[in-house]
Design a protein with these regions (language model features):
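Acidic, metal-coordinating catalytic segment for phosphate/diphosphate chemistry
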Residues: 102-201
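DNA-contacting surface of Y-family translesion DNA polymerases
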Residues: 2-126
Length: 201
């Protein structure tokens, strides 16, 4: 996007082309409208079929981290405390939290914190529910000049993705774990249909 000719971007993105190209360079001059009344932002799901595979559990944590990060950015907020909630098949519910050195609105950082919290939970049975929450909220204080190279790229990528999804919809550009989740749901649906299908005599 940074190297693309503006005319070509405009033909695809329309009026949003200038904004999206500026965001790709880390320039965001939109007004900050943070709500101080919001104390926490979270997302959770209850699963029809208990999750037992570590890869499936981690993918759900990634998805919820992504949803939370998007909501934080939408409200121009960053969360310093990250919490992971896990409910097992036995309805045993465990919540763990940790505080970061600085607030974040990035999926990658929220996900990393949630995975660290998962290590503190005894995962000895199927998982019925997973939730990720960010609290201790405040407007982001960082400036792009202070970011590490990796974090700067993550910030720019998140801004570009937000702008594209805002214009073209959530499915216009998605991270890989969302696509993997869609495949998992399709497989579950097929298994359900096969079980419900009448047996041939």
């Amino acid at each position: 996007i940074q190297k693309a000719p503006f005319a070509k971007l405009a033909s695809v993105l329309g009026n949003q082309a200038s904004l999206i190209q500026r965001l790709s360079f880390g320039v965001d001059d939109r007004a900050v409208e943070a709500s101080r009344r919001i104390k926490s932002i979270g997302d959770e799901s209850t699963y029809e079929k208990d999750l037992t595979e570590p890869a499936d559990i981690d993918r759900q944590i990634a998805i919820h981290s992504d949803v939370v990060a998007k909501r934080l950015r939408r409200h121009k907020l960053a969360g310093r405390t990250i919490s992971l909630k896990v409910r097992f098949a036995s309805f045993r519910t465990v919540t763990r939290s940790l505080s970061l050195e600085e607030g974040t609105d990035l999926q990658e950082e929220i996900y990393a914190a949630a995975l660290e919290l998962k290590k503190r939970i005894y995962m000895n049975e199927g998982v019925r529910l997973i939730g990720v929450t960010a609290s201790n909220l405040a407007p982001p204080l960082e400036t792009v000049d202070l970011f590490s190279t990796v974090r700067e790229k993550q910030v720019k990528a998140a801004a570009v993705m937000d702008a594209i999804q805002e214009k073209f919809g959530e499915h216009a550009l998605r991270k890989g774990f969302w696509l993997e989740e869609e495949k998992r749901k399709e497989m579950e649906e097929k298994e359900k249909e096969n079980k419900e299908a009448p047996e041939e005599e």
